[in-house]
From Swiss-Prot:
The modification Phosphothreonine is found at T215. Residues 390-419 are annotated as: PPI. The gene is CIPK13. Residues 57-311 form the Protein kinase domain. Gene3D superfamilies: Kinase associated domain 1, KA1, Transferase(Phosphotransferase) domain 1. Residues 366-387 form the NAF domain. It is an enzyme of class 2 (transferase). The lineage of its organism: Eukaryota, Viridiplantae, Streptophyta, Embryophyta, Tracheophyta. The active site is at D179. This is CBL-interacting serine/threonine-protein kinase 13. ATP binds at L63, G64, H65, G66, S67, F68, A69, K70, V71, K86. Interacts with CBL2 and CBL3.
Amino acid sequence: MAQVLSTPLAIPGPTPIQFMAGLLARIVTKNTNKETSTPESPRSPRTPQGSILMDKYEIGKLLGHGSFAKVYLARNIHSGEDVAIKVIDKEKIVKSGLAGHIKREISILRRVRHPYIVHLLEVMATKTKIYIVMEYVRGGELYNTVARGRLREGTARRYFQQLISSVAFCHSRGVYHRDLKLENLLLDDKGNVKVSDFGLSVVSEQLKQEGICQTFCGTPAYLAPEVLTRKGYEGAKADIWSCGVILFVLMAGYLPFDDKNILVMYTKIYKGQFKCPKWFSPELARLVTRMLDTNPDTRITIPEIMKHRWFKKGFKHVKFYIENDKLCREDDDNDDDDSSSLSSGRSSTASEGDAEFDIKRVDSMPRPASLNAFDILSFSDLSGLFEEGGQGARFVSAAPMTKIISKLEEIAKEVKFMVRKKDWSVRLEGCREGAKGPLTIRVEIFELTPSLVVVEVKKKGGNIEEYEEFCNKELRPQLEKLMHYQADEVEEVMCLPPEIEQ
C-alpha cells in the first residue's frame, strides 16, 4: 500500500513566463467531461459524436481542449483500436505564429518512437484542420498516482527506469524534452510509463553555440539552476535534473524545491537547498544528490545513472524495432537468453561494453537458414547483381557472413544509423525523420550453397525515395566488392529437380 502523506503533493502556480510557455506548448490544457462537444469535419462545420473521420476513425467523447485544439477519444473502425485525435484549427495556429511549432512537435514525435513514449500513429489534414492521431493512454497521469501518497521503492524504481530508458533514447536521437514532470508522464493499462508532451522539446540541429539551449522554458519546480541563469544550458543535463526531481517526488511524495513564493523557490533551486527524507536508502540519496547537482559539469550523466547500483536492480533493457512503420516490442523473459544485440554509430541506451560483447558474439551465431527450391524459385534471378525490386533488393556473395555483417555495421556507423542484430538478420535504423518516420532497413543472409549466400535487403520503415537513395549512394557502392559474379555457379544452383520445374 502506498503511504498517504498528511499534505498533498503541491505544485506552485505558474508565473507569467510559465503561463506563456504552457500556452504555446500544451495544446490540451483543460480536462472536461462534456460529451456533447464534437470535432469539426472537413465536410461540414460540425461532426456529431459517432461520426466517421476520413473513413477510418469513429469519433467518441471529448477528452480535453485548449486555445487551438480539441482532443477526442476515437476508435479505428478497421482494427478496433482506441486512439486520441488532436484536432487543430489551421487558421488559429497560423495567425498565432505557431505553425512551425506544430510541425516541429510532429517531426520530433516521428523521431522518438519508443515503447515508453506516447506513439504518434498518423497525421492527416484538410484545408482547415490538422488531425494528429496518437496512442490513447488509459492510465492517466503519474501525477495522480503520486498525489495519493509516495510510492513503494520497487514501484518508483521501475517507473524511473522506464523514464531514463526513454530519455536516453531521446538524447541518442538528438532530442531534448525540456519539460519533464509528473504531469507529462502517463501510465498505460499495463502500468508502464509513457512520456508525453514534446511541445517544448528541441532537437540538436536547432541549437546554436555548440549545442547550447537559450530558451527559458519548462515548469518552475522542475527547472535546472542553469536554466534560471538565462546564460545558456545543455538540454541533456537540464533533462537529467528534471528526472532527479521526478525521482525525488516518486519516493518522497512531495517536491524537493517548493515554496509559495516563486522567487524563494528559485533561490532554493539555484543553491540546491533540499534534504532527502529519512526513509531514502543511502544509495538512493546519493543518486538523487548526484542528479540534483547544481553544477551541470559534475552532474551525473545518463550512462552513469544506468550503471548506478540503485538503478540497476531488476533493470532490463527494453528491446524493440520498427517494422512497416510500426513499433514492435521484443519481450524476453530471460535476460540470459538474449538473442538480439545492439550497436550504433551514435550514442544509445546500450553501453560501450554491451556493444563490444554483442559484436564478439557474431562468430558464435547459429548457422543461417538454407534456401530450398521454392525459395530459389521465388528469388527468380540470382545473377549476382544488386537486383532491385520495389522495396527490396538482393545479391549473391561468396564473402564470409561475418564480413558482410561487419561491413553493414561499418556503413551504419558512417551514416549514424543504429544496428540491431538477431542471428543472421541485421536491422539498420536511421535517426532522420522522413514523411513516414525514420528509414528502417532489414538485411537477411541465407545460405545458398556451402560457399555462397544470398543477401536480401528490404525496406521496413520510412519512405521509398529515402530508401532508394540510401541503397544507391551508401549500400550498393560499399557492398559491390562483396557481390559474387560467377554466373555458372549460380546457374548450377538454379537447376531444380524435375518435379519442382513441372
